Amino acid sequence: MERCSRCHRLLLLLPLVLGLSAAPGWAGAPPVDVLRALRFPSLPDGVRRAKGICPADVAYRVARPAQLSAPTRQLFPGGFPKDFSLLTVVRTRPGLQAPLLTLYSAQGVRQLGLELGRPVRFLYEDQTGRPQPPSQPVFRGLSLADGKWHRVAVAVKGQSVTLIVDCKKRVTRPLPRSARPVLDTHGVIIFGARILDEEVFEGDVQELAIVPGVQAAYESCEQKELECEGGQRERPQNQQPHRAQRSPQQQPSRLHRPQNQEPQSQPTESLYYDYEPPYYDVMTTGTTPDYQDPTPGEEEEILESSLLPPLEEEQTDLQVPPTADRFQAEEYGEGGTDPPEGPYDYTYGYGDDYREETELGPALSAETAHSGAAAHGPRGLKGEKGEPAVLEPGMLVEGPPGPEGPAGLIGPPGIQGNPGPVGDPGERGPPGRAGLPGSDGAPGPPGTSLMLPFRFGSGGGDKGPVVAAQEAQAQAILQQARLALRGPPGPMGYTGRPGPLGQPGSPGLKGESGDLGPQGPRGPQGLTGPPGKAGRRGRAGADGARGMPGDPGVKGDRGFDGLPGLPGEKGHRGDTGAQGLPGPPGEDGERGDDGEIGPRGLPGESGPRGLLGPKGPPGIPGPPGVRGMDGPQGPKGSLGPQGEPGPPGQQGTPGTQGLPGPQGAIGPHGEKGPQGKPGLPGMPGSDGPPGHPGKEGPPGTKGNQGPSGPQGPLGYPGPRGVKGVDGIRGLKGHKGEKGEDGFPGFKGDIGVKGDRGEVGVPGSRGEDGPEGPKGRTGPTGDPGPPGLMGEKGKLGVPGLPGYPGRQGPKGSLGFPGFPGASGEKGARGLSGKSGPRGERGPTGPRGQRGPRGATGKSGAKGTSGGDGPHGPPGERGLPGPQGPNGFPGPKGPLGPPGKDGLPGHPGQRGEVGFQGKTGPPGPPGVVGPQGAAGETGPMGERGHPGPPGPPGEQGLPGTAGKEGTKGDPGPPGAPGKDGPAGLRGFPGERGLPGTAGGPGLKGNEGPSGPPGPAGSPGERGAAGSGGPIGPPGRPGPQGPPGAAGEKGVPGEKGPIGPTGRDGVQGPVGLPGPAGPPGVAGEDGDKGEVGDPGQKGTKGNKGEHGPPGPPGPIGPVGQPGAAGADGEPGARGPQGHFGAKGDEGTRGFNGPPGPIGLQGLPGPSGEKGETGDVGPMGPPGPPGPRGPAGPNGADGPQGPPGGVGNLGPPGEKGEPGESGSPGIQGEPGVKGPRGERGEKGESGQPGEPGPPGPKGPTGDDGPKGNPGPVGFPGDPGPPGEGGPRGQDGAKGDRGEDGEPGQPGSPGPTGENGPPGPLGKRGPAGSPGSEGRQGGKGAKGDPGAIGAPGKTGPVGPAGPAGKPGPDGLRGLPGSVGQQGRPGATGQAGPPGPVGPPGLPGLRGDAGAKGEKGHPGLIGLIGPPGEQGEKGDRGLPGPQGSPGQKGEMGIPGASGPIGPGGPPGLPGPAGPKGAKGATGPGGPKGEKGVQGPPGHPGPPGEVIQPLPIQMPKKTRRSVDGSRLMQEDEAIPTGGAPGSPGGLEEIFGSLDSLREEIEQMRRPTGTQDSPARTCQDLKLCHPELPDGEYWVDPNQGCARDAFRVFCNFTAGGETCVTPRDDVTQFSYVDSEGSPVGVVQLTFLRLLSVSAHQDVSYPCSGAARDGPLRLRGANEDELSPETSPYVKEFRDGCQTQQGRTVLEVRTPVLEQLPVLDASFSDLGAPPRRGGVLLGPVCFMG
């Protein structure tokens, strides 16, 4: 066996299994190769290969972006050893001070670490927090940051740690840890970095291992002889002649790699070990005691550079290749070669001050070496007085521990911690039902499957340890670090295997609303709903803008003392003081190895007088902070004067999210889940604060004596033995060289001032020692000269808060702070004193509408004025109904600042906000405790205030808040645009009688009739119409007050009147609209009712309040002048039906209205109930000529006949010819009241007949049903404003009345333009009614006299000539329902007149019963395809709305289960022509309806010609749906049935086409976008093959896929199996385009694909590597989205199935596959790809 292999196969001498004392459970445990555990051979990001310490070695170069970590449990599944060795071969960048390896606990506490540089630090902290940071070992005087290779070993045993560097220098430091130290292995181990530390390791590393026990650290030095190839060295003469001569028990144990493979060639290879006993090169004989660690009090520091002399003179014949240890200049900038190392002489000569030492430690004394025990003689005499001990730098003399300090204050509660770590996976669920059988795959051609050659792996290791929830715990540990050390996002972690199919779940909640459908036809206007309930009180509005700075306030009282300031910067080490005088003589003590602290020296010379700072209040010192890392030495900056506080900067944007709080408590462990894959290494966690030391556990009981073990190997020389017998005092030795600076001792008491010595030469500055205890306060010194401005130091670690100090003086008024969070409502404060009235401010914008004020008392009646040009305004009418709340006005300008109110009660503590970035420096705080005196710097100039800091970065989104309470309804939206005019609605049922209309305008006076005979005095006639307006008469006496009138119709809102005087302050207004939802706050307690506030300034005029109770009738005012025409108001909402009014006087006929537009025929309504008998109607117009019948004699009126049964429909008769108009018949006798008939079926519309001649004007008939609502008229000109009325006397304020119930709105009629109002005549006294005089002779016409009194109504005169068409009259209000008139004799049926123009739209009637479904209107052109929007957030649950009216029929739903046969229904009307079926039999003509009232003559509107759409792929030509003989030209008769059938057929076909577009069926002509869309539209579809078209263009590129509805609607595409590189085809074998796959990815959220390959006898094949569609390499080792679904190769049978399930949709489908063991011979089998399935 060759003496040396490559140096990267470092032969680590491992402890023997026999007789080694290691930590429990670690006997024979293997070493841990940290580089391999961190996957260095696979070269992760930031790592590349480099040359090692020997040219042929392999090392790894680590750059800054590398992030290398792994769960600690993965490396140490059995726990971390108590005693261990840490071995490494490393080369760092010159000048670097960075960690090499750090181990963190689950709580993020740094437990173990090794930091390289100058100096070398070893970090250790066990579970009890020991040792404290100041006691952690630091190896000063060593520098490993020189850019050269170093072999470093660290041995930790007991209470000490030993560092061995290059086998030349060995330093031991105490490690005061607990007796049973335990390190937590549930955390993470990180290479080359620390959490929240900028310094990272940069350099090369060849070996890094952790070995249980300490022997490996010492044995590693024996391998110095096993250097690079060709560098074999001679052995010293005192060593054994040759390795081959050793006994088998003397062979050293070595750590090997297979020599025929490189570390990176086989990723799955494991280290294996052969154990050889160690050999020792010691000149002593006999047995060697076991290794003993030094006691905590002793310090062992052996610098063996003198013991291992340079070797140039001893090795002149050894030739080393020039590249053996050459440092690469291009890497770190240093060149040259190191001198070769030769064999060392491990023996030393004996002298006065020397003992025999080996390379590995001190040798044994003669007594110990031979006998194993020291024989003690009699006690010697008392020795002479010892010399004073000289504490040289480098020595550490530990004094006794000080008394326990007082307990610190309870710290403030920490911010809310992050969520705890994810618990272990739960128990496996019960197996689900068996899935549906998959469809049979297409049989592939034999032997043409894709064959990818496999190769067997040459070796296989055992399965790794179980890692249950390491990744989740590591993430929880490292959450704090992800903000500070945010690297590129790592790959997603492994997911567990999918469980079996579960039981079907309960029905899910209602899904979200689908996409908005096309706009339907506009429905009829619904009734106005009742007024809604008053909304809840809105939330407080957003905080106002920042106000202007107020005037400076009065200086306040002194505030409480602030918290102690941050610790000051550490001062420089002072110069060495003069040598103290010898102390008083002490008693002679026994000579010890290391003496106790010597007698205290004389006090040193007093230092220069320092400046005395202002004395601050004594604060209680906080506990010591965590020791920070030693930064690079910088120049000491001088302390500048305190600057004045600068003006506050602009408000910055919210800073980034602060660091999370401390880790929450670990939850209880869940039950152990199935074994998961090893998790990816987590990010490093942050430095946690040191934990409090735990209580020392009770000592355990002494164990039983164990059996004697076998003879162990020859041990190493132990540490220093116990004190021997006092020897003879030796001669005083030569003065030794100055040692390194030691730790400063405790400050002694102030001694007597000595004489001033001469100024010595300033010495060189030593290294910074640890910070000593605080010195006493020195006397006040004179101020020094101003110094230079120093650099700004780094921000120190904030100390713990101290006690609050005393109250300081009140500071000046600061600038307004940022608005705070809204606190809870405080209790009502006391009423403040009334302030002086301020000056009148500018008129603010109109505020929100307030509630109705209390009704004021009636004002005093004004005096009657004379007839002026304009009378005073009339009495105020009753208030109208409450209108809707107006939109809130714009925010007014900020008023002047009010007086300070009484302080409210403190609100509840708010939730802790996110920590922002460090803001700009604040104003100076209270003077903290006196810091350590620094060097007196020169005084700097006074600085200017700094500019405001830049705005912080945008904060990260916070965690989700608590679910807020239900918000108030938002403000009403803006009115939408007018939709297209809808079809005419169905006629409603007859409305209830409305209120009586007002009197009509006076008609034209008719011609005087011939005088009739004098009649007897009849009953008093009805009041006649008003005559012409006479001249104004004299004012009559005051009439009696009239009875209270009916409530009038709400008047229109008049113009805004002149500004009135200041009114009494109104009550609080209604809440405004809901503001934007704020942060959810907790419900506060209800506050108390406050006292009334001060009188406010005059408010703007409020809107009309709700109607109050009717007031007393006031006196009749003087007639006012006629006002100008008002502006017609907007149409009011539909009011409730009013109570039946008294019968009004008969009005005059209004002029006929304009001709309306033609309406579509509506379905016949149900027959209404028979009304009461009405008055006889006027003679009707001449009817159409009927068929000639035989003239019969008029018989006497017969008794009323009974109601006959409904006869069967007659056959369709031929249309008769139009006859000439018949003679007007006499009005028939009133017939009996008939019973209510059943609803008749709709008859076919008759052909229009010619218009008949205009008949004579008849008497007024009964009031007809309200006509359709007319279009709103043009707005009239605005009326002139009336003159301002005189101010009434100010009435006393009335008591607040009970708020009245809101009155029901009255019926709203359309307001027409009001006619000119005549002056009101005086009220005449009622005269007695005289008898009618006799007939007088006709006299000559006299002159036109004054208008006489209104005479009685005369008899109806003959019909006058038809006047010209008048202007369009106003629609009258709904009259009472008239009694039914007598049934007239049936007239002959006339020809059907032409359809009249549609009339004006009448008032909306009451909701009618459900009518027949109307015809579907023509569909509009399809809009452009919109992009699929993102799914919106679910809105807040709205209050349940009233039930809406029946909408138009929806699309046909899925076929339901067949119901039981129903009862035979009545025959329905003939349906429209179907889309594709043959024409049905012609329906029977319905019974001829009674002739309607002839409409006014109008123009015949020709129907528009129907333009058929051009035939496209997705439309159907309507004319093709009819038989050829039924098709008619477009210019045919518009009223013929064939044209309507064609239209209806086209509508049906269009409806089907639209239905297929809205609800695709998955066929080739109606493809869906994805299978998810098919599932949403047709949830009843089974699994199978369907057509999809993801890009929704032309359907020619649609392709067929397999839809797995059972799995939620997956769209699966099958790969081809006849090519060497995978491509994907549809179910018919056609390739799927790249564009279609891209669209399919855009419509999906995840995808998965299975890959399987057969096993062929090997225990495990090499890893399968897959290439995704985006060229990513996918394998279980590199991607968290690839996992083994079934491992058949583990049992050497079946197949192994990998599942790729990824949210990165660009990775699928898989395009190629290969194996990593391609060097092996091929074997049977290939890779079988399953379909790729996309889930939308």
From Swiss-Prot:
Residues 57-228 form the Laminin G-like domain. Residues 1501-1736 form a propeptide. Ca(2+) binds at D1589, N1591, Q1592, C1594, D1597. Residues 227-303, 330-465, 485-1538 are annotated as: Disordered. Residues 399-447, 487-545, 546-590, 805-862, 863-899, 1099-1156, 1157-1172, 1441-1499 form the Collagen-like domain. Residues 1541-1735 form the Fibrillar collagen NC1 domain. Residues 994-1003 have a biased composition (Gly residues). Residues 615-624, 1029-1040, 1176-1187, 1388-1397, 1457-1467 have a biased composition (Pro residues). Residues 487-1500 are annotated as: Triple-helical region. It comes from the Eukaryota. Disulfide bonds join C1571-C1603, C1612-C1733, C1655-C1689. Residues 239-253, 406-421, 497-533, 542-552, 650-663, 842-861, 897-906, 1115-1133, 1217-1230, 1346-1365, 1376-1386, 1413-1422 have a biased composition (Low complexity). It is found in: Secreted, Extracellular space, Extracellular matrix. Keywords: Calcium, Collagen, Deafness, Disease variant, Disulfide bond, Dwarfism, Extracellular matrix, Glycoprotein, Hydroxylation, Metal-binding, Non-syndromic deafness, Repeat, Secreted, Signal, Stickler syndrome. Transmembrane segments: none annotated. Residues 1-27 form the signal peptide. Its main location: secreted. SUPFAM superfamilies: Concanavalin A-like lectins/glucanases. The C-terminal propeptide, also known as COLFI domain, have crucial roles in tissue growth and repair by controlling both the intracellular assembly of procollagen molecules and the extracellular assembly of collagen fibrils. It binds a calcium ion which is essential for its function. It is linked to Otospondylomegaepiphyseal dysplasia, autosomal dominant: An autosomal dominant form of otospondylomegaepiphyseal dysplasia, a disorder characterized by sensorineural deafness, enlarged epiphyses, mild platyspondyly, and disproportionate shortness of the limbs. Total body length is normal. Typical facial features are mid-face hypoplasia, short upturned nose and depressed nasal bridge. Most patients have Pierre Robin sequence including an opening in the roof of the mouth (cleft palate) and a small lower jaw (micrognathia). Ocular symptoms are absent. Otospondylomegaepiphyseal dysplasia, autosomal recessive: An autosomal recessive form of otospondylomegaepiphyseal dysplasia, a disorder characterized by sensorineural deafness, enlarged epiphyses, mild platyspondyly, and disproportionate shortness of the limbs. Total body length is normal. Typical facial features are mid-face hypoplasia, short upturned nose and depressed nasal bridge. Most patients have Pierre Robin sequence including an opening in the roof of the mouth (cleft palate) and a small lower jaw (micrognathia). Ocular symptoms are absent. This is Collagen alpha-2(XI) chain. It comes from Homo sapiens. The gene is COL11A2.
